[in-house]
Amino acid sequence: MSFIPHKLEQIKKMLDTIGASSVDQLFDEIPRHLRADTLNIKDGINEIQLANLMRKRANKNHHNINYIGAGAYSHHIPAAIWDIVARGEFYTAYTPYQAEASQGGLQVIYEFQTMMAGLTGMDASNASMYDGATALAESVLMAIRSNKKAKSQKVLIAEALHPTYLRVLETITKHQGIEFDIVNLDSKNGKTDVTKLEDFANTNYAAVVIQSPNFLGQLADVDGITNWAHKHGALVIAVTNPMSLAILKSPAEWGDNGADIVCGEGQPIGVPLASGGPYFGFMTCKMAHVRQMPGRIVGKTVDLDGNEGFCLTLQAREQHIRRAKATSNICTNQGLMVTAATIYMSLLGAEGLERVASISHENTQTLATELAKINGVSIRFNSAFFNEVVIDLPVNAETFVTEMEKEAIDAGYFLGEYHSDLANSIMVCATEIHTSEDIKEYIEATKKVLARIGG
């Protein structure tokens, strides 16, 4: 019995309509060597036999210890979180337009907004964006709309911004007349030299983007850059790891007046690694800019009987109300991921988040210190970091990473793809899930691999 709902004639008609010659052509962007022509399953096997076959194949997967980081982080997620998220009341992609039928979901989003505003020190938060990269792109568009005093649509970006974020930012803003200037990082400390900003002092910018911790794991001179930006009439967009804010000062405390908009990737707070997603982006801002904020915003109100309730608010900003004048064409939020993050933050509390962040930093410090004791291995930058650090190796880093996989360790992020000067460098990340025994195994594996490949 075939479970495919379409007949061959129907498939041909659909392909003709879109101008494709075959179903395979719909997937031609996938390289041929990655495609499977068959599932290699015998004909006529029953469901029990099929399940046993799949289990045997699944057992061939190797679960390496992960030290990669670079924007997606391995944190422990208590079992209770996704048990609650998977309940039918939450397990939906529905956007809660009908407040009278959605009070539970709306309250979760409201609690999320409250927590994110508190974590970042801002006045308001939206209900989330697609991911960290799109949250940054929307933040740039928001800043340009909001900065009425700016005489240009130029944005200044510190070079150590996550490269994927920069590519997404350029893609989304490509046809909107927005220009970007890049401030080169200091090769000695892996972050922006504030004195270099004076080279851009004669250019009018609508916004300045600061990532801290930056892509290389270093803590930026957020006070100096923020004050410089405000002095020159630019809004400050902070890109940050929410977990780091449990032990670092909030963007609201950067410089004399704080950042204006804060965004980033929410994956570290309750969302598992899953081949790139789904994750969620967060965005918070000062109240002065809230009417230019994209996405859903949930507010708390009272009904005619004086009962407390929740509803979507400031909806005139959104495309389902005023399409031509909407702040964005984003038409949903990552509600399920937001639910997980809300439960995660509620379950851990402020002290729990601080403990996770502190242990992550301490484990990274220990790993880096022990690696630097190995002959030929060193810490590249002599500056403060959170839970990622760049390590210089005496061998090609890509080869090292490949060899470490044979030791069941994902050793770190190969930085040669990011910058040609870093071909012998990797970025390593440790979190609270890495034990002292794990770190010892990493050190011993490093010695073994370097001896094997000639380091």
Swiss-Prot record:
The name this protein goes by in its record: Probable glycine dehydrogenase (decarboxylating) subunit 1
Protein family membership: Belongs to the GcvP family. N-terminal subunit subfamily.
Enzyme class (EC, first level): oxidoreductase
Catalytic activity: N(6)-[(R)-lipoyl]-L-lysyl-[glycine-cleavage complex H protein] + glycine + H(+) = N(6)-[(R)-S(8)-aminomethyldihydrolipoyl]-L-lysyl-[glycine-cleavage complex H protein] + CO2
Organism of this sequence: Francisella tularensis subsp. holarctica (strain FTNF002-00 / FTA)
Subunit structure: The glycine cleavage system is composed of four proteins: P, T, L and H. In this organism, the P 'protein' is a heterodimer of two subunits.
Keywords of the record: Oxidoreductase
Function: The glycine cleavage system catalyzes the degradation of glycine. The P protein binds the alpha-amino group of glycine through its pyridoxal phosphate cofactor; CO(2) is released and the remaining methylamine moiety is then transferred to the lipoamide cofactor of the H protein.
EC number: 1.4.4.2
Regions crossing the membrane: none
